[in-house]
Amino acid sequence: MKSTISLLLVVICTVVLAAQQSQAKKGCQAYGHVCYGGHGKRSLSPGSGSGTGVGGGMGEAASGGQEPDYVRPNGLLPMMAPNEQVPLEGDFNDYPARQVLYKIMKSWFNRPRRPASRLGELDYPLANSAELNGVN
């Protein structure tokens, strides 16, 4: 009985590992982006025909001199063109939205703190309330 259960577990584990390996071999092509090394490498030349084939006009320009937006087949996430490189991360000053947010946060944190104007009307007693109210 124990040998049958252990044999069944080994078979199940083998099937699961084989399924994972078959999914892993799809590589980057399953996600529609360029792989650098390994299997599933997309060719950088548009005429080779070994790409994933998102559209027939990958190298063609759209109307208005702009290249078309490259979208995954499911339409959820944009992907890069075959000859496009990852844009470099810009400097902090290149992001005006960050600058605006930084200025707002800085003004909030650098705002002078004023003491409560009505210390005598507080709902709770202070430890040194006599000193704060000027009573000796």
UniProtKB/Swiss-Prot annotation:
Disruption phenotype: Reduced food intake in adults and larvae, reduced locomotor activity, delayed development with mutants taking 200 hours to develop from egg to pupa compared to 130 hours for wild-type flies, reduced levels of the insulin-like peptides Ilp2 and Ilp3, and reduced wing size. Reduced levels of insulin-like peptide Ilp5 and reduced body weight of mid-third instar larvae. GO terms for cellular component: extracellular space. The modification Histidine amide is found at residue 39. The keyword Disulfide bond applies. The keyword Iron does not apply. One of its GO terms (molecular function) is neuropeptide hormone activity. Induction: Repressed in larvae by starvation for 18 hours with levels recovering when larvae are refed with yeast or glucose. Disulfide bonds join 28-35. Residues 1-24 form the signal peptide. Residues 42-78 are annotated as: Disordered. GO terms for biological process: neuropeptide signaling pathway. It is found in: Secreted. Residues 43-136 form a propeptide. InterPro entries: CCHa1/2. Keywords: Amidation, Disulfide bond, Hormone, Neuropeptide, Secreted, Signal. Residues 48-59 have a biased composition (Gly residues). Expressed in endocrine cells of the larval midgut (at protein level). Also expressed in endocrine cells of the midgut of adult males and females (at protein level). In the midgut, expression occurs mainly in the anterior region (at protein level). In the larval central nervous system, expressed in about 40 neurons in the brain hemispheres and ventral nerve cord (at protein level). Highly expressed in larval and adult gut with low levels in larval and adult brain. Very little expression in the larval fat body. Ligand for the CCHamide-2 receptor CCHa2-R. In one study, shown to be an orexigenic peptide which induces appetite and stimulates food intake, leading to the release of insulin-like peptides which stimulate growth. In another study, shown to be a nutrient-sensitive peptide derived from peripheral tissues which controls growth by directly regulating the production and release of insulin-like peptides. This is Neuropeptide CCHamide-2. It comes from Drosophila melanogaster (Fruit fly). The gene is CCHa2.
